[in-house]
A protein has these predicted regions:
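Charge-dense, helix-prone N-terminal extensions
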Residues: 1-163
Length: 163
């Protein structure tokens, strides 16, 4: 172990204060860590993150919660759907393939210049368009699953061509 590093329930804190995870976190543990994050925040950000989480699970009951990148809640189904980051003045939902999604309700209001990701910044007091967010989540899941089935069919056709 590094001199001066400390160990927590989530992993090892390095001397630079970074959380260093030894193993991937199991889904049950990830959900418990998201619960803990919501409680730790204890303000409007915790309530917003809890609401976002609720809407994600309503939109796709099969979604999997993960805990990645030194403490970021991640929701996946066939690949990463979105993350839930909390900052001092904003709760940010970053959609991994957001640039490929149609957003008729114009929920995306951040990371608009990127070629792949898009984000929704939720500020204190803002109301979430629940129906539009659920539609966006469902579209992100469908895009992930569509990509998986395309890659499976490509592999199968390459195998047939090779034989």
């Amino acid at each position: 172990m590094l001199r001066g590093a400390q160990v927590t329930r989530r992993g090892k804190i390095t001397t630079k204060g970074e959380l260093y995870m030894k193993k991937p976190v199991a889904a049950e543990s990830a959900s418990a860590l998201v619960d803990e994050r919501i409680r730790e925040l204890g303000d409007w950000r915790g309530k917003a993150l809890a609401k976002v989480r609720e809407l994600i699970h309503e939109a796709d009951p099969e979604i999997v919660e993960e805990w990645k990148w030194r403490g970021t809640p991640v929701w996946s189904h066939g690949g990463i759907v979105c993350t839930g980051e909390t900052y001092q003045k904003v709760v940010k939902m970053t959609f991994a393939k957001g640039a490929a999604l149609k957003d008729p309700s114009r929920l995306f209001n951040s990371s608009l210049e990127g070629n792949v990701r898009r984000a929704i910044d939720i500020h204190e007091g803002e109301k979430i368009n629940e129906a539009a967010l659920k539609d966006l989540i469902r579209a992100a899941v469908a895009l992930n699953l569509e990509g998986k089935s395309k890659s499976k069919s490509r592999r199968a056709s390459r195998k047939r061509a090779a034989s």
